[in-house]
A protein has these predicted regions:
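Bacterial N-terminal signal peptides that target proteins for export
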Residues: 1-8
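Substrate-binding cleft of secreted/luminal carbohydrate-active enzymes
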Residues: 29, 114, 118, 255-353
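Mature N-terminal, pre-catalytic/accessory segment of carbohydrate-active enzymes
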Residues: 22-53
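Aromatic-lined carbohydrate-binding surfaces of glycoside hydrolases
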Residues: 44-207, 214-216, 222-241, 257-259, ...
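Acidic (Asp/Glu)-rich catalytic clusters
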Residues: 67-74, 101-109, 179, 216-218, ...
Length: 353
């Protein structure tokens, strides 16, 4: 074989390998696309099992009063979002009054409180951090985050800023001192953010998340701790895997912080290739959690317009439960109190036995 022929054969092999790689990657990204089909036969009633079910209230805590969850045997309690701003009205001065009220109210019905600590918002009119952080000393404390269409989407606490993070750690310590062992658990908000800060670093952000996780665990050695780890800026799985999200899951398992995610979307590729894949593929001793949030009851995310809210739909609650239990091996499920779906789909499907 001549030199020219050898070169041609080598080029052909390289081209074939490259083409195989191109066809393999799409298949990897589709590997769980039909996983939900196994659970299409799931039906009501959803029986009592090992999953701890909580009803989620997104900063509308007053709705727990006389709520149906209080008398329902399937629900262990309420997950309520509290903003950093509410809990620390002034620097170093904490006010946990609403936490105590909610904890005691739930306790009177033999239910438990699960705290979600808010430092990120999806509303440009509201910042979840105390006013003192919005100063030059903390570089403004927050930055704008943007939606996929480049429109402003809310505000993100500068988790990657050491001075901001130090204050967050002090808040966790104060919370843990009073509530560790008294509440069911506490979780940090999702890791997914859409920022354009000139000083933002992907690597520093991952380090910051891990530091917050460690602070959380040290502050709450007894109650369940959890972080909603769904996406990390700068990588997109499975093709562009820089180890960011994977590292968060490994670290959580290492230090004893539970791992979870918002938005149980069983048909959405993004969710299937990130948080849901991490849960399905890993072996964990820490608790796993998944949230059914606004829109998820009809396969959407975020706020749903009135037309969709009022349209006829088929309940997917049995499917979501079966998928979470078998495919994800979940320990905690957080069902948002979204009308009309919580009453029409969840309450009617959950067994009272």
């Amino acid at each position: 074989m001549s030199t020219v022929e050898k070169c041609f054969m080598l080029l052909l092999v390289l081209l074939t390998t490259a083409l195989q790689g191109q066809t393999t990657e799409p298949k990897r990204s589709e590997r769980y696309a039909k996983a939900y089909e196994k659970y299409l036969g799931a039906s009501c009633p959803v029986p009592k099992d090992s999953i701890q079910h909580f009803v989620y209230f997104a900063r509308d805590r007053e709705l727990i009063k006389d709520h149906p969850l209080l008398s329902h045997p399937m629900f262990k309690g309420a997950q309520i979002m509290y903003s950093w701003r509410e809990l620390e009205p002034e620097k170093g001065k904490y006010d946990f009054t609403i936490l105590r009220e909610d904890m005691e109210y739930l306790k009177s019905y033999r239910k438990r409180l699960f705290i979600q600590l808010q430092d990120v918002t999806f509303n440009i009119k509201y910042k979840a951090v105390p006013d003192y952080l919005l100063t030059e000393e903390y570089d403004g404390g927050v930055v704008m985050q943007y939606n996929d269409d480049d429109s402003p989407g809310g505000w993100v606490a500068q988790r990657w800023n050491k001075t901001v993070r130090a204050q967050f750690s002090l808040l966790l310590q104060a919370l843990g001192k009073e509530f560790d062992g008294k509440i069911e658990g506490i979780n940090l908000q999702e890791t997914s953010i859409g920022v354009r800060d000139s000083v933002f670093s992907e690597l520093e952000y991952v380090v910051a998340l891990k530091e917050n996780m460690l602070s959380l665990k040290k502050s709450f050695p007894t109650s369940t701790t959890m972080i909603y780890a769904n996406f990390i800026p700068g990588e997109w799985l499975p093709g562009d895997d820089k180890g960011y999200l994977r590292g968060i899951y490994q670290y959580g398992e290492q230090i004893g912080v539970g791992l979870g995610g918002p938005d149980l979307m069983v048909k959405r590729k993004g969710q299937l290739n990130h948080a849901l894949a991490m849960m399905h593929e890993g072996q964990y001793t820490v608790p796993l959690g998944i949230a059914v949030q606004d829109g998820n009851y009809i396969g959407e995310t975020g706020d749903i317009d009135n037309e969709k809210k009022n349209s006829t739909h088929h309940s997917i609650v049995p499917l979501l439960h079966a998928f979470a239990k078998d495919f994800l091996k979940i320990n905690y499920m957080f069902w948002v109190d979204q009308e009309p779906y919580f009453k029409t789909d969840v309450l009617t499907c959950f067994s009272r036995e």
